[in-house]
């Protein structure tokens, strides 16, 4: 049974935008740890609903642009799914009333994935940025983005190799951690699927040794 669920006290996801008060709990995707080996885990994730956008640029520029686009959707640039009228839905605290929009609770992490068959964090120029939506939502009841650059998508249950590490996320360091993840997978004969992903959990003021970063690499069911 999928049983793991963590909560963080506050987050800006390392991209320099303040958005959650320290008292706010952040929901994370549910998963079960299948195998653990030092800084590596094989996880089985439950199905999720994500908001995503495709952006161009280097890793840092694309992360910032994609974050802002999806944050704009989450914080009000949306249309309620069950009504032609636009109305504020108070899902977080403190509540700020804005007509004609719905506010969606935040989750962690934000995920960055190179696109167009590109697996190098150093050379990729097109990226998929996504946020996992709170678990009470489905495609039927979640507010819909007004910006066509942001789309909603259901992601089925999947397996990932996850490489956990702390510190800063320079492009070179992320590539090194990605290479280590691929090497770990190859040595254990896992079948890799798609491009690696970088997931970040912490606000920018978090001390480097306390930052939580993860390289995620999808694999076939072990």
Q: Which ranges hold each PLM region?
A:
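A solvent-exposed interaction/effector surface
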Residues: 2-10, 14-222
